[in-house]
Design a protein with these regions (language model features):
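Residues that form generic nucleotide/phosphate-binding pockets
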Residues: 14-15, 28-29, 99, 188-196, ...
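Short, charged alpha-helical interaction segments and adjacent helix-coil junctions
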Residues: 2-3, 69, 73, 80-85, ...
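Extended serine/threonine-enriched, polar tracts that run as long, contiguous segments within proteins
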Residues: 152-199
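Short hinge/gating elements
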Residues: 6-13, 175-176, 205-210
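Short conserved micro-motifs at the rims of enzyme active sites and ligand-binding pockets
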Residues: 137-139, 182-187, 236
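Accessory alpha/beta interaction modules
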Residues: 1-169
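Selected N-terminal structured segments and early membrane-anchoring regions
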Residues: 114-115, 176, 224
């Protein structure tokens, strides 16, 4: 079956707009039953500073971070942040740290028996990485929080509302480490993200060669097939790829400019230090000269 590559921001956005798929995706990764999912993509508009009338200027997909508020089977509300990061980039890491900090400061609207309320929710982060982490040899990793008694080092089977809101669990998917295994529900879901069997060099369209084990897997495959075969959607995906190329080029220019500015600042700092040293030497020479003049005047007066 021909499908669109779900690592594409637009494709992932399309999938997550389907409530059944979003719930299946989150339940599978988080390994818990979810009663409700309210997911909203956080779009960061992209504008080409050279030509605002261009097609890429109208494309609002350059960074698609997804925020979901969920209600678990035990009635607990949580906030899930989903980040697609295709390349290892320091700017992206710092951007998401700031983005995470902003969400820690926010209160979220939830529906309760008492009506709508605004509360600070526990946060869960999901990172879909397009690169490998060194020494982390697994396609899917859970970084969990534990309550450990530091006196006797025993794990405590408890929960504190305050602690839950000050710490968070993380789920990391390393897309390049996904292999052709379908033994578990998680492996079946991740098989759509496997970066093999592309039909051309663009990396946008691929063949999905595996059996579809259940209705939700078939639903995902059908949505990806539609995106991968509809001519208008294919053109939209190609546009996104071009916009991403422009974005990366401009990002490279920004990083280069930052590096050049750092070098220039270091040179200025060195020049200032050298000038300071020169001024100090001149001040010392001047003071020495003044001291000699003063001594000469004293000697002259003494001789008279």
């Amino acid at each position: 079956m021909i499908i669109a590559n779900p690592i594409s921001d637009l494709v992932f956005k399309w999938l997550m707009s389907n409530d059944r798929i979003a719930r299946f995706f989150l339940e599978t990764l988080l390994e818990q039953d979810i009663l409700e999912v309210h997911l909203k993509p956080q779009e960061l508009p992209y504008f080409n500073k050279e030509d605002d009338a261009s097609l890429s200027a109208a494309l609002t997909v350059m960074r698609l971070d997804f925020v979901a508020t969920i209600k678990t089977a035990d009635g607990e509300h949580k906030k899930v942040l989903i980040e697609i990061q295709k390349a290892r980039n320091t700017i992206d890491v710092m951007r998401f740290r700031n983005y995470l900090a902003e969400h820690y400061k926010q209160e979220d609207e939830i529906e309760t028996d008492k009506g709508k309320q605004y509360v600070a929710l526990p946060i869960i982060t999901i990172y879909l990485l397009g690169f490998k982490l060194q020494n982390v040899d697994t396609p899917a990793l859970k970084v969990a929080t534990q309550y450990i008694n530091q006196v006797n080092h025993e794990v405590m089977n408890i929960k504190s509302d305050l602690i839950e809101k000050l710490t968070h669990e993380s789920y990391i998917v390393q897309i390049p480490r996904i292999e052709a295994k379908l033994n578990t529900r998680l492996e079946q879901l991740l098989s759509f993200f496997e970066q093999n069997y592309f039909t051309d060099s663009s990396g946008l369209i691929k063949e999905y060669p595996y059996p579809l084990e259940n209705d939700l897997m078939k639903l995902i495959a059908d949505e990806l097939h539609y995106l991968g075969t509809d001519p208008q959607k294919q053109q939209y995906l190609a546009t996104e790829k071009e916009a991403m190329r422009v974005y990366k080029h401009e990002l490279f220019e920004i990083e280069l400019e930052v590096e050049e500015n750092k070098i220039a600042l270091e040179k200025m700092k060195k020049t200032l230090e050298e000038n300071k040293k020169t001024i100090e030497e001149k001040d010392k020479a001047l003071q020495d000269a003044l001291d000699k003049i003063a001594e000469f005047e004293r000697n002259k007066n003494d001789s008279q």
